[in-house]
Amino acid sequence: MGNKQGKMDVILIGAGIMSATLGTLLKELAPEWDIVVFERLEEAGAESSNEWNNAGTGHAALCELNYTVEKADGSIDIGKAIKINEQFYVSLQFWAYLVNSGILRDPKDFVRPLPHMSFVQGEDNVAFLKKRHETMAANPLFKGMEFTDDPKKLAEWVPLMMEGRVVDEPIAATRIESGTDVNFGALTRQLFEHLKRKNVEIRYRHHVEDIKRTSDGLWELKVRNLDTGTVELHAAKFVFIGAGGGSLHLLQKSGIPEGKGIGGFPVSGLFMVCNNPEVVEQHHAKVYGKAKVGAPPMSVPHLDTRFIDNQKMLLFGPFAGFSPKFLKNGSMLDLFTSIKPHNVLTILAAGVKNMSLTNYLIQQVLLSKEQRMQELREFVPTAKSDEWDIVVAGQRVQVIKDTESGGKGTLQFGTEVVHAADGSIAALLGASPGASTAVHVMLEVMEKCFPERMNEWRAKVKEMIPSYGESLMKNEALLRQVQASTAEALGLNGHFAMQLA
């Protein structure tokens, strides 16, 4: 039996961007609450939030073609893009508040302005992109988005991508200045430094082995100190499971009925990073292409300017891979041990329904360096093999569950909150847009888990996030105000110049 510790108001499991965001929100709204964080690794932001384990895209649906779909009548549905864009503005507003309050330091350490572009080839794809641009540019959220199918204009926008290119089919791109590159690792670390100053106890190298409900309605966690091997029991009124790929196992251990019937499918990612600074300097944008037929949404190829440790870099990917691990630092048994009697049929159904995904992953795993270079050359025709290295990114666990629309064993490509009916425990599952919408998602957790308190907190939340509870698309005056204030605070001036014009 472990050594029993005191009772806390809140326990956060996992020191990633989600726990960092929730902890920071709670400390602004309920500074008197006692909060403790448990993290298995030795530092914050070391798994999916780490800057090398994600693409660093501020997902605002400016360039990601999988967030806009062509309907049967040929029109473009931008509903999902609108939703994600508004959610990213929530993050920008909160970060701006934290900078203005002195909680976050120099914003360029974690966010930089960077044009976002969509790039396609082939007659049908160009027609789709043109229609998408017409639909989006008419919306206030996407004002300022440009379209061109002129190779000369493209050579101005992306010289590296056009150099040496044989243009033997239609080619086009959209470009919008208001994109961002976000270093979620740096942001996470800064937020945890702040929480430490606010007397939040952060226990690194502490692994949560079990979660159970006690007779008095608390949640008791069995926590092992990985340095000493000792086990402690910690209790809290509210528990947030923000452990990335580790969340599903912990949700299952909690025993809440809402966690039944959910499975996870792990997908790993590889990127290619350019080691020639002269090549890196020739590109300044995040350029997203179109997923190949049969490929999953998270496989959309993109060529990204990144800023890591204040150094400009150039990455291309992702190439998908498969590992049964649910975390980069996880166990090879993760997938197997996540299969339970209550989710086995759901997982099997997903396997049958997603043979194309399975085949795609097998093909990706077997790619040689030269085959990866061929894919890169679709973006950078002059790419030389010795100037690009392969880096292994993080693991993502896609949610599998039964849905009304998709039926049994449907793969959910997105971010999902699962919470107990009484709001005493919540878990975050899934992947993209993930970190970009962290503030919106954590407010959703708070609305579901602290509904009465949210009424008291509403005025303070509105102070931090002026658009809270409103649609920016429907309130253009507020949108302009938010664009101007976030650009000013986050050093993104010029960032919204075209929208504000």
Swiss-Prot record:
Q: Which Pfam families match?
A: Mqo
Q: Does the record bear Oxidoreductase in its keywords? A: yes
Catalytic activity from the UniProt record: (S)-malate + a quinone = a quinol + oxaloacetate
- EC assignment: the record states 1.1.5.4
Q: Does the entry feature the keyword Signal, yes or no?
A: no
Q: Which InterPro entries match?
A: FAD/NAD-bd_sf (IPR036188), MQO (IPR006231)
Hey, which pathway is this one from? Carbohydrate metabolism; tricarboxylic acid cycle; oxaloacetate from (S)-malate (quinone route): step 1/1
Care to name a GO molecular-function term for this sequence?
L-malate dehydrogenase (quinone) activity
**Biological processes annotated in GO:** tricarboxylic acid cycle
The protein's required cofactors = FAD
- Keywords, alphabetical: FAD, Flavoprotein, Oxidoreductase, Tricarboxylic acid cycle
Q: HAMAP family under this entry? A: MQO (MF_00212)
Per the record, the similarity remark reads: Belongs to the MQO family.
What name does the UniProt record give this protein?
Probable malate:quinone oxidoreductase
Instruction: State the encoding gene.
Output: mqo
